[in-house]
Amino acid sequence: MASYEIFITFGIYLVFLMAIGVYFYSKTTTHESYVLGDRGVGYWVTAMSAQASDMSGWLLLGLPGAVYMSGLTEIWVVIGLALGTYLNWKFVAPALRIQTEKYNSLTIPSFISQKLNDNKGYIRTFSAIVILFFFTIYSASGLVASGKLFDSLLGIDYKWGVLIGGGTIIVYTFLGGYLATCWTDFFQGCLMFFAIIVVPVVAYFNGG
């Protein structure tokens, strides 16, 4: 069982995330501000938020486990991911920003539908279903990571870990929308970056 200091730290962490949602609740006064933050989130926050959401439990739990089991052959995953991320932000993101502003689109399905003059909404419906299907699977993997973290670190039952992690996300997203999501991800992304840099160094010196 984890010490009470760890429980207190995790408690403060979860409360802080929900406090961000409460703070941005008053900032989301329109549909566009709730969905896209009025397109006013800076590139640092946007980039860190996107990468924290994209990597999340996979980067800190899945990839280290894969490297431990398979060795440095897993480094190709990192190289491919880094290259793909760079190309995405270099070429896809700027063009997508310009085009979505041009069509005043709030979501990818609505942009594709407007771009291709899909008056009957077939493309919008199909693309929304595809996104919903695959993101449900990906989101589930993040909740699994949350459950495993609570179980291994705090000794809390896996199911309760999933519920606590998922419940926290639902609360701050429901309250603050896109802005709350971006800033909580930015905060967590900074923690992830710090952990990636510090933990290997500490492990190396402690392990001799």
Name each model-derived stretch.
Residues M1-E5, G65-W76, S152, F205:
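Helix-coil boundary and interhelical linker segments in multi-pass alpha-helical membrane proteins
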Residues M1-L60, T173-G176:
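Membrane-interface "cap" regions at the ends of multi-pass membrane proteins
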Residues L14-L17, S53-D54, L81-T85, I131-L132, ...:
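Residue-level recognition of pore/gate-forming positions within transmembrane alpha-helices
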Residues V35-N104:
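Membrane-interface helix-loop-helix modules in multi-pass membrane proteins
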Residues Y43-S49, Q114-K115, Q188-V202:
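Small-residue-rich segments of transmembrane alpha-helices in multi-pass membrane proteins
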Residues W76-T173:
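Helix-loop-helix module between adjacent transmembrane segments
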Residues P94-I98, V202-G208:
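Extracellular/periplasmic helix-exit of transmembrane alpha-helices
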